[in-house]
């Protein structure tokens, strides 16, 4: 995995209760939002109240395999760690992130890395890549959820062709 220069803007501010809003607005249930789930998981683990308002300005296309919801969850974990004075190297943060989604731990660190298992087990971390132009194309009409993509793959798995070659190139 490697991060690209495309991001949502996640703003976390103190509030009377936990709320999550997206710009543009979405009819997706707030309680299912990964940022909301991350705030709840952090509060439960650290015995705190997640009295925050999370505003997410969406720029990462949904259902494009770019980790948009996972980046938002990671941003909330980082924001609450900072707000509550929790050391960013606390291993519990990775555990909390993993409970939200397999790729959320990657977005806590965002260093190029090779993950194994369900995509949640760090095998190798690499130094930052030099700035490389990347073109991303995501047609409006074409979308597939990550869950659906993995379900389809599991129905007809294809063995990876020399994943070590990709890792060596990094």
Where in this protein do the model-derived segments appear?
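ATP-dependent small-molecule kinase catalytic core of the GHMP/sugar-kinase superfamily
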Residues: 86-170
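ATP-binding N-lobe of GHMP and related small-molecule kinases
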Residues: 1-64, 82-94, 128-130, 138-142
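Gly/Ser/Thr-rich beta-alpha loop segments that engage phosphate groups in nucleotides
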Residues: 35, 65-71, 103, 119-121
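Alpha-helical scaffold segments in soluble metabolic enzymes
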Residues: 37, 41, 79, 148, ...
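Short, small-residue alpha-helix embedded
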Residues: 70-83
């Amino acid at each position: 995995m490697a991060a690209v220069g495309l991001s949502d803007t996640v703003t976390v501010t103190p509030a009377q209760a936990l709320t999550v809003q997206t710009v543009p607005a979405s009819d997706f249930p707030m309680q299912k939002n990964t940022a909301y789930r991350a705030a709840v998981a952090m509060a439960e683990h650290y015995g705190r109240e997640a009295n925050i308002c999370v505003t997410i300005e969406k720029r990462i296309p949904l259902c494009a395999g770019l980790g948009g919801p996972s980046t938002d969850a990671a941003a909330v974990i980082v924001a609450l760690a900072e707000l509550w004075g929790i050391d960013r190297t606390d291993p519990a943060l990775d555990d909390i992130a993993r409970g939200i989604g397999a790729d959320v731990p990657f977005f806590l660190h965002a260093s190029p890395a090779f993950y194994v298992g369900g995509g949640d087990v760090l095998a190798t971390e690499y130094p930052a890549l030099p700035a490389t132009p990347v073109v991303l194309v995501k047609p409006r009409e074409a979308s597939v959820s990550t869950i659906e993509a993995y379900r389809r793959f599991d129905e007809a798995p294809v063995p990876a062709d020399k994943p070590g070659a990709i890792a060596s190139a990094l």
